[in-house]
């Protein structure tokens, strides 16, 4: 496979020098303030992943968050809906451990559906790093947040990346996200400026 291709109505391009990919011209990782791997490390640190924990990683991408969590000794289940993204990950040297670390289990499927298969309280922590709201609004829905709440153990932690889309135009999503997380049952919902996401606790 070439590092760029058109498939399933989308144009995919691997940008190895930046450690990211583009889908329809949109970069899937933070590349301005820091490189994607460092960004993933920061998210995992913010979540407080520890050795022996069971972690759910929603939206695998190139696998940096799953790798970072597994390298801390956590058992990671990671979900990716787009097989084309995983094919690009196999061509990315920095993603090699995603396919080699025995602590990582990859599920190919729609997270909205796959999360229903997990038991109540199955995970110690959830790292939810979805595409932009305009691309995958269902992963920002109250229905999905209810499921993330359900699969977390009591006292379990959530990190939810959102970024700050639309805020310059007065159409930000953060207030709505925080409100729906609270409606789903989460407590201690706090914004983390460094990682551009919310932390919350069950």
Regions found by a protein language model. Name each.
Residues 164-202:
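Class I S-adenosyl-L-methionine
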Residues 81-119:
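S-adenosyl-L-methionine
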Residues 50-61, 77:
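Conserved class I S-adenosyl-L-methionine
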Residues 34-53:
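Conserved alpha-helix/loop element of class I SAM-dependent methyltransferases that forms part
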Residues 155-162:
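Conserved beta-strand signature within the Rossmann-like core of class I S-adenosyl-L-methionine
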Residues 1-15:
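N-terminal auxiliary segments of SAM/dcSAM-dependent transferases
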Residues 62-74:
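Conserved SAM-binding loop of SAM-dependent methyltransferases across substrates and taxa
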Residues 140-154:
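A short glycine-rich, Lys/Arg-flanked "PGG" loop and its adjoining helix->strand segment in the class I
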């Amino acid at each position: 496979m070439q590092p760029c291709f058109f498939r399933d109505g989308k144009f995919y391009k691997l940008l190895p020098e930046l450690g990211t990919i583009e889908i329809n011209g949109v970069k899937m990782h933070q590349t301005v303030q820091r490189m994607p791997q460092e960004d993933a490390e920061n998210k995992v640190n913010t979540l407080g992943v520890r050795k022996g924990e069971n972690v759910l990683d929603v939206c695998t991408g190139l696998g940096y968050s799953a790798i970072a969590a597994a390298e801390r000794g956590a058992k990671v289940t990671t979900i990716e809906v787009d097989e084309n993204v995983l094919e690009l990950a196999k061509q990315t040297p920095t993603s090699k451990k995603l396919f080699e670390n025995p602590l990582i289990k990859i599920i190919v499927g729609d997270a909205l559906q796959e999360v229903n298969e997990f038991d109540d309280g199955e995970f110690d922590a959830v790292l939810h790093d979805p595409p932009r709201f305009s691309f995958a609004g269902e992963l920002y829905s109250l229905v999905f947040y209810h499921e993330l709440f359900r699969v977390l153990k009591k006292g379990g932690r959530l990190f939810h990346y959102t970024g700050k889309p639309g805020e310059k135009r007065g159409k930000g999503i953060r207030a709505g996200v925080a409100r729906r997380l609270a409606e789903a049952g989460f407590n201690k919902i706090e914004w983390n400026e460094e990682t551009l996401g919310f932390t919350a606790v069950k």
